[in-house]
């Protein structure tokens, strides 16, 4: 069927901010869909609240709305734009649930909008647990015994039917949110109540436990002529009980018999037909009982998902692009496969002759109080993917690509394992607990002498995978005993098992450099193979490569398929797996670098190992290497690329800390670095050198010191005086950073921090309390400087910049203060000889007085996480311009002007606290947010100043982050001593808006002295009914709670946690409270209007 001509405009709903379970993969799918449908001539309207995405760039869709993704706001966009169709399958659970709400409330019918890609009844049938189960029964496919329940009483009846342990799965939630495994009745009740609360339809499925079963997924694409293909089979190495997003997975499935595979293939196609998915990709999940082969269907996603991003990158088959075109009427046989240059149609099922391994990355260390346990609710924040010719090569590449300091199956300590009497029991106990380290625990168990059968009994991993790991451990023993192989054949055999030079160095008590020299002396180097989706059957025209050391049965080395070009080229190093502090913002910059190089005729070569991202899409750059970002892997691909053509250099300043760590190794190897020199980057990171630079420029810094021993740290701390901030040098995302307020806190920090040394000193900075923090992003070519953005933080200094809301332009700073910040930024950029991007963080004491004091906190001569937000606000492709400057263009040639604009943008951080029980939500100097949203609004006619526009933009940023500010009700206000003067105005604003205000004794007395009367409520420790009781009874709609000091934090912990669980908006800084009060007073939700991004740029 040719494409539909009865529709001309299509609305695509994005996924919103990056949260656990919904990350960059939806930027990747959204970009593919927009590009594919625009190429077909449709007008594309896009809504997404996340500014750090490529899809929200003004040239990706025809009308781009950076607005909150709520049914009310999307309805306003529909009313304004009148699209013919809505495609809800590209934006994860957020888009599906929003589309269903618009269908249910009659918006789609009212404006004549047709849902394409998946109809409402299809989504409902797939996502509603009971309807899905009924559909499986109809097909004669088994699913686990289960009951759908809408109340706790119904769930208790369901429990009698399924027994304990039981799995609880809420309907219509993302990545297992609210679900879990209950081993006893108390846990069961707790999980069911939470699940019912978090499910938008108040429904949970109580399901028999299939813990320990093998888990598989099938990625299926179907068109309206009923052509179906399996793009990829995926096997979870972790057994059932661990969410598939937290599981280590391999593609293709490696341990299915052909009979089982064919059964699963037929079953997944039958599932799509029965559910009614007519156009597009879906994934179907199965569980297999290893004891008797019983096979059951677990669930399906009727949309593009995290697994489909993995399947796309694993095979080279662009699922999202194909799904988008199927949604407008094409059939699979009418579409060409890009990877083979159109030699095969899209109906040609991909086949692969390599093994892909995905390992998730976790951030439990960022959430003190959370247990690093894996369950059916997803907790990982990122993932790495690696490709090898064998499972061993693939899994070892993935382990080093995680960037958690591993070089392979590094040793891990198991508590009690060395006990001569009970050591074996300790190892078996450790194997039974699903943690992020379980793969290494398995390897360690083999080192302790356990057999494959014993390990299998303890952790339910498939014996085939266990034998592979046992072989790796055995080989490590041989290397330890006999040293490095002396022949090329022997060395190649080792490298073909995936051993990194760094791991071999550890095993032989040598250095990585020495191992590399020995390997290269024997001329043992990897070859590069192409991902072609057809296992070499047709010629691949797309340069999408991975490395391997594989060799033939007779020792012959396979042909290298890299085929580097003779062009002028530049290599962009990506950011690797997502983590807190380094995420999609950096991928955004890497993509822009590739686009910019393309525009100036330089070949772009991308290196990255994150399967979720746009940067690892085969058509983002000219050439793509899917490789771990380690010195060894990068130097090997550069060796091949430099054999032909001219390498202009490597770009290291766009991928966050990951590529910067490689800059020195590259420089030593004689590889040119584009942009700011590694020495200048070092100068900005090196405390003492940077201080000299600032002194020379007469720029102030908070009093600070550097300590190389704990005694020195204590002495320096006493000199600076409390409070001060302590942190290790060279970190991203505020890792290990803490505000120290007394000697006790200092000793606690020292006890938990480990060793410090000459190489790894500790930094101390005087903490500027009540200072306003400001971020400045600038472009520099060594001669001229353009200040792209000045962002005023809403939370005061002391909250990590990545976790603070901020406003651009500044909402309260004086014009002369902003000018002074720009002047100092220009001075530093020129002094550091920056070429490309630079970010400065300032703190301003008494910013509103006649004499504000400006201090520089830090300078980063690289891309910062605010770059995409700044680019969207000023309508300039900041990252792309930076890339062109690095390639030699002058800043002056872009004609950038600092022009005032009549709109205001607010960036707000989004946190995953709800997924980590027992974690305090108070903000501090260590970054804990996973993503961000942008609220954008403009000055209306007749408004004086930006105040009203700021209130609306702030309200939108809260709404986009999932916080709906109340318009009436009761607010609870309790603040620390130093904040009391700053809480009077927010309370007055709330009372004027009709709110009742409750306060604890101290805050109430202070407000009364200022002539503001509020009602008293007891603290938790003062007897009942106390504030938490009132909150649990639904008596509070808004919380302002600020604290300091260990005891006060502990006392008020329950208030913040209850607010989170009851979905009550809460603010833990006085500045955040003021912004919220202004938004409530000045911007009720119905007053919010929508406007496309393109119209702001045209101002």
UniProtKB/Swiss-Prot annotation:
Binding site for ATP 2: 727, 766, 768, 773, 798-801, 841, 858
Binding site for Mn(2+) 4: 858, 860
Pfam families according to UniProt: CPSase_L_D2, CPSase_L_D3, MGS
Binding site for Mn(2+) 2: 299, 301
Residues given in the record as Mn(2+) 1 binding sites: 285, 299
KW Ribosomal protein (keyword) present: no
Record gene name: carB
Recorded domain comment: The large subunit is composed of 2 ATP-grasp domains that are involved in binding the 2 ATP molecules needed for carbamoyl phosphate synthesis. The N-terminal ATP-grasp domain (referred to as the carboxyphosphate synthetic component) catalyzes the ATP-dependent phosphorylation of hydrogencarbonate to carboxyphosphate and the subsequent nucleophilic attack by ammonia to form a carbamate intermediate.
Protein's name in the database: Carbamoyl phosphate synthase large chain
């Amino acid at each position: 069927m040719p494409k539909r001509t009865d529709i001309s405009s299509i609305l695509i709903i994005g996924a919103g901010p990056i949260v656990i379970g919904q990350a960059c993969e939806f930027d990747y799918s959204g970009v593919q869909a927009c590009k594919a449908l625009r190429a077909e001539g449709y007008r594309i309207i896009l809504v997404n609240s996340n500014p750090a995405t490529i899809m929200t760039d003004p040239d990706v869709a025809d009308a781009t709305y950076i607005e909150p993704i709520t049914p009310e706001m999307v309805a306003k966009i529909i009313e304004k734009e009148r699209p013919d169709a809505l495609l809800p399958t590209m934006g994860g659970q957020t888009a599906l649930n929003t589309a269903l709400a618009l269908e249910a409330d009659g918006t789609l019918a009212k404006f004549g909008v047709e849902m394409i890609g998946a109809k409402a009844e299809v989504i409902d049938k797939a996502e509603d647990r009971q309807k899905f189960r009924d559909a499986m029964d109809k097909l004669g496919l088994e699913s686990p015994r289960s009951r759908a329940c809408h109340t706790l009483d119904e769930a208790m009846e369901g429990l009698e039917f399924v027994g304990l342990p039981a799995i609880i799965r809420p309907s219509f939630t993302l990545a297992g949110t609210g679900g879990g495994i209950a081993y006893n009745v108390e846990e069961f009740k707790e999980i069911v109540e939470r699940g019912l609360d978090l499910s938008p339809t108040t429904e949970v499925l109580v399901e028999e436990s299939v813990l320990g079963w093998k888990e598989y997924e099938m990625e299926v694409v179907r068109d309206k002529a009923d052509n179906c293909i399996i793009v990829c089979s995926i096997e979870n190495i972790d057994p059932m009980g661990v969410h598939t997003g937290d599981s280590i997975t391999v593609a293709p499935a490696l341990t299915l018999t052909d009979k089982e595979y064919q059964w699963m293939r037929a079953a997944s196609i039958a599932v799509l037909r029965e559910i009614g998915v007519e156009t597009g990709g879906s994934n179907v999940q199965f569980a297999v009982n290893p004891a008797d082969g019983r096979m059951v269907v677990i669930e399906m996603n009727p949309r593009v998902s995290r697994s489909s991003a993995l399947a796309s990158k694993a095979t080279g088959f662009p699922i999202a692009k194909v799904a988008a075109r199927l949604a407008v009427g094409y059939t699979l046989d009418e579409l060409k496969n890009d990877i083979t240059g159109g030699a095969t149609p899209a109906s040609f099922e991909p086949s692969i002759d390599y093994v892909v391994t995905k390992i998730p990355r976790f951030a439990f260390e960022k959430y003190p109080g959370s247990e690093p346990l894996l369950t059916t609710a997803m907790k990982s924040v990122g993932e790495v993917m690696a490709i090898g010719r064998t499972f061993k090569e693939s899994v070892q590449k993935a382990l080093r690509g995680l960037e958690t300091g591993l070089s392979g199956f590094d040793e891990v300590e198991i508590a009690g394992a060395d006990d001569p009497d009970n050591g074996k029991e300790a190892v078996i106990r450790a194997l039974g607990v699903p943690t992020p380290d379980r793969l290494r625990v398995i390897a360690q168990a083999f080192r302790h002498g356990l057999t494959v059968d014993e390990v299998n009994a303890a952790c339910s991993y498939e014996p085939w995978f266990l034998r592979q790991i046992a072989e790796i451990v055995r080989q490590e023993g041989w290397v330890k005993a006999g040293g490095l192989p002396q022949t090329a054949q022997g060395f190649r055999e080792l490298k073909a098992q995936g051993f990194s030079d760094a791991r071999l160095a550890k095993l032989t008590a040598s250095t990585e450099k020495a191992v590399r020299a020995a390997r290269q002396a024997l001329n043992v180097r990897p070859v590069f193979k192409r991902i072609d989706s057809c296992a070499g059957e047709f010629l691949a025209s797309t340069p999408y490569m991975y490395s391997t050391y594989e060799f033939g049965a007779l020792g012959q080395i396979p042909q290298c398929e890299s085929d580097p070009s003779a062009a002028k080229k530049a290599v962009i190093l990506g950011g690797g797996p997502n983590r807190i502090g380094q995420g999609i913002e950096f991928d955004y910059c890497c993509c822009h670098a590739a686009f910019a190089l393309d525009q100036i005729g330089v070949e772009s070569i991308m290196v990255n190992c994150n399967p979720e991202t746009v940067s690892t899409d085969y058509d983002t750059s000219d050439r793509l290497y899917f490789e771990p970002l380690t010195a060894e892997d990068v130097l090997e691909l550069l060796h091949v690329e430099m054999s032909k053509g001219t390498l202009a250099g490597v770009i290291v300043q766009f991928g966050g800390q990951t590529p910067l760590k490689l800059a020195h190794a590259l420089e030593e190897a004689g590889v040119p670095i584009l942009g700011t020199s590694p020495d200048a980057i070092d100068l900005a990171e090196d405390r003492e050198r940077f201080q000299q630079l600032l002194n020379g420029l007469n720029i102030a810094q908070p009093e600070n010191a550097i300590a190389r021993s704990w005694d020195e740290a204590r002495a320096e701390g006493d000199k600076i005086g409390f409070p001060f901030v302590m942190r290790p040098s060279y970190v991203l995302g505020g890792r290990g950073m803490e505000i120290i307020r007394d000697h006790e806190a200092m000793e606690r920090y020292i006890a938990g921090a480990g060793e410090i040394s000459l190489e790894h000193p500790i930094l101390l900075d005087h903490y500027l309390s009540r200072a306003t923090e400001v971020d400045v992003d600038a472009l520099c070519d060594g001669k001229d400087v353009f200040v792209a953005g000045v962002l005023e933080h809403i939370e005061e200094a002391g909250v990590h910049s990545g976790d603070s809301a901020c406003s651009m332009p500044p909402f309260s700073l004086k014009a002369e203060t902003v000018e002074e910040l720009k002047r100092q930024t220009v001075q530093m950029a020129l002094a550091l000889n920056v070429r490309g991007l630079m970010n400065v963080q300032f703190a301003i004491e008494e910013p509103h007085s006649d004499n504000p004091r400006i201090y520089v906190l830090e300078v980063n001569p690289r891309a910062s996480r605010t770059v995409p937000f700044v680019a969207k606000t000023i309508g300039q492709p900041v990252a792309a311009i930076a890339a062109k400057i690095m390639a030699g263009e002058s800043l002056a040639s872009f004609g950038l002007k600092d022009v005032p604009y009549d709109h205001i943008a607010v960036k707000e951080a989004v946190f995953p606290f709800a997924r980590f029980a027992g974690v305090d939500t108070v903000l501090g100097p260590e970054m804990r947010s996973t993503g961000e949203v942008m609220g954008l609004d403009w000055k209306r006619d007749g408004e004086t100043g930006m105040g009203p526009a700021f209130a609306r933009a702030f309200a939108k940023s809260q709404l986009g982050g999932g916080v709906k500010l109340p318009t009436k009700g009761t607010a609870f206000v309790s603040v620390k001593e130093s904040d009391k003067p700053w809480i009077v105005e927010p309370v007055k604003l709330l009372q004027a808006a009709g709110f009742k205000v409750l306060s604890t004794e101290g805050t109430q007395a202070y407000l009364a002295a200022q002539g503001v009367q509020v009602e008293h409520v007891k603290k938790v420790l003062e007897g009942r009914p106390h504030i938490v009781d009132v909150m649990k009874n639904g008596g509070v709609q808004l919380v302002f709670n600020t604290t300091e000091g260990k005891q006060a934090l502990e006392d008020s912990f329950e208030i913040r946690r209850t607010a989170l669980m009851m979905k009550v908006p809460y603010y833990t800084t006085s500045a955040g409270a003021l912004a919220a009060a202004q938004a409530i007073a000045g911007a009720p939700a119905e007053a919010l209007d929508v406007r496309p991004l393109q119209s702001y740029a045209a101002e």
